[in-house]
Amino acid sequence: EGIKATSIENAGKKAGYPIGPLALSDEVNIALVGKIRKQILKYDDNSSTGPWDKVIDQMVSKFNRIGKSQNSGFYEYPLGEKKYIWKALESHFPVSINQIPEKDIIERLIFSQILEAIYCYQDNIITSFKDANTGSILGLGFPKSSGGVLEYVNSYGPQNFNERCLELAKKYGKRFHPPKLLVQMAKTNTLFI
């Protein structure tokens, strides 16, 4: 979407994630991230392709930048030195004049994980409020200060969270559309327990 790489990384850190999303992609392996995305698109009706899919595909297939294990991904990893964002990144993926507000970047990062957790809770894949929160912090690196994915919704308020999801969906696509469970909770102002 033409967002500066530093803006993405800084937003992730401001949100409370241990590392930025691009650094995390490098740690995990960009090729693996691409394979996961393809599986999600194949089996999840709520997912849609976006500009990030092109970025992931080109990083792997065109530029052979797999991640930290190969010393080259979104970051460069010079031996014995501090990592830095790949200098050619913006020449291959130009930055847009119209930047997305930082608040939106932060909430898009956070809300995308929360919405996936709510779908899992709705479909009884996750059946415990405590497990959802603990798993999100320990397994996904979700910001600790939030208390976890479902506690975040409780703190934000189900009605407010639902409304913000609708705003994000209108601006950034259906992936932010609230799940049925959240819509029901917003109507009755019910909290996750």
Label each region the model flagged:
Residues 1-193:
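N-terminal glycine-rich phosphate-binding loop for ADP-containing cofactors
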